[in-house]
């Protein structure tokens, strides 16, 4: 059995070698010759999986180690009798922590408290729900918009997108990319929406680049609209609008979900799905794969305020470490993908063990996802 895996999927070689011969290949572009005798293909979001790639090939299963699936033609795979699995929710925690790192940086720079802001969350799936929970644990008001879930009658106080635009100080997008249909998200943030945002609002896109109309956004920024922008995703990736990058406050190369834990979850989820597909079901405990974190433990004295939270968050991950490298190489062919391929190891908040002498601080940090304990001061 021959299994092709994206060379940037951590732990893929070790795990899939339990099931057969493993060949690591680049994800963009996939070397088509390798598909001629392969049984399975494991990809990330950079690989377009469709009829033109796989027609006439012996591939029996495709796995994507990503939550999103808009790079995969699922209908064609089903028609062709090819098994498929994604990794829903694998990087949701990472994306939430990316948003927090960005917001805490902007709050410190611009001198505001997040408690004084209302956050509108567009898309309330794996990422949106977790973001809502952490924001509300901090006492920050949220507004939710998710028409598909609202129409299904899912639990939640869902509001219209127009209401979020009118009321939210921060608008953050966490939707799939639907190019048509009743829940179309292509250019969901169009010129009309962008112009309607509150003065001084913060716009965040960490889902799919085309959810925000990049040309319209640049037009509004060039005309002097008072707007802070955080973009992790771009229309036309791996190409991007370099002028737009110079105008946004934070710009990163589609790495919001790139924690080691998130990548490992993606790999293990598709590994488990494929092992079940071939009748050799196996389960993997994530903590058996991950290395010890860089920071063992720290001690926190007193209550948890916003400056202290910012220091803890940025100790684990400061979004500026990914903003600066992109600005240096933007516009140079191939560099966007190189930044992703050679991405520095990044951990999640749970990797940081925090000893608190304040019980409420320990409790709150645990709700936020840190590994915190209460040890009273002596």
Curated annotation (Swiss-Prot):
Q: Which SUPFAM superfamilies match?
A: Formate/glycerate dehydrogenase catalytic domain-like, NAD(P)-binding Rossmann-fold domains
Q: Which residues bind NAD(+)?
A: 146, 175, 232, 257
Q: Keywords for this entry?
A: Cytoplasm, NAD, Oxidoreductase, Pyridoxine biosynthesis
GO CC aspect terms? cytosol
GO terms, molecular function: 4-phosphoerythronate dehydrogenase activity; NAD binding; protein dimerization activity
Task: Write out the annotated subcellular location.
Answer: Cytoplasm
Q: Which reaction does it catalyse?
A: 4-phospho-D-erythronate + NAD(+) = (R)-3-hydroxy-2-oxo-4-phosphooxybutanoate + NADH + H(+)
Q: Which GO terms describe its biological process?
A: 'de novo' pyridoxal 5'-phosphate biosynthetic process; pyridoxine biosynthetic process
Quote any Pfam family the record assigns: DUF3410
* Active site per the UniProt annotation: 208, 237, 254 (proton donor)
Under which EC number(s) is this enzyme classified? 1.1.1.290
- What pathway annotation does it carry? Cofactor biosynthesis; pyridoxine 5'-phosphate biosynthesis; pyridoxine 5'-phosphate from D-erythrose 4-phosphate: step 2/5
Q: Which InterPro entries match?
A: D-isomer_2_OHA_DH_cat_dom, D-isomer_DH_CS, D-isomer_DH_CS1, D-isomer_DH_NAD-bd, Erythronate-4-P_DHase, Erythronate-4-P_DHase_dimer, NAD(P)-bd_dom_sf, PdxB_dimer_sf
Enzyme class, UniProt record, top EC level: oxidoreductase
Q: Which Gene3D superfamilies match?
A: 3.30.1370.170, NAD(P)-binding Rossmann-like Domain
**Similarity comment text for this entry:** Belongs to the D-isomer specific 2-hydroxyacid dehydrogenase family. PdxB subfamily.
Q: Which NCBIfam families match?
A: PRK00257.1 (NF001309), PRK15438.1 (NF011966)
Role according to the record: Catalyzes the oxidation of erythronate-4-phosphate to 3-hydroxy-2-oxo-4-phosphonooxybutanoate.
The entry describes its oligomerization and partners as: Homodimer.
Q: Which protein is depicted?
A: Erythronate-4-phosphate dehydrogenase
